[in-house]
């Protein structure tokens, strides 16, 4: 499936509006990325492709960035896997916000960066190891709760 063709089909559907459109576009994007992930990666328990930010919330518009995290458990071949995932996405003309990290690296960054911390709150797995993704989400939520008194004033200040 071409995500470009699917986006055009969804845009041409005059019945789709607002949140229903964003949900269907997110679902179509999920399927496209799941197919891509399956073609690049054999079944492995040390990798997960995770949607974060607006994409994690299933709030995609036609020009939204695809914000994704390739989570790994210290995979030695991660650089070649990442390139095999990112290039087909770029070839489709997609704007890609991407990162490649372990759980520890992700939590270390989220501990210091409000944007990363909040993006993890709306993260969801697209493909790969559910247990690896669940571990990250659980630890990120614990970390968020432990830093609530620090983060909430910063979050409030960023809104104004």
Predicted region positions:
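N-terminal regions immediately upstream of nucleotidyltransferase
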Residues: 1-45, 63
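Hydrophobic/basic alpha-helical segments enriched in Actinobacteria
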Residues: 6-7, 21, 70-73, 81-82
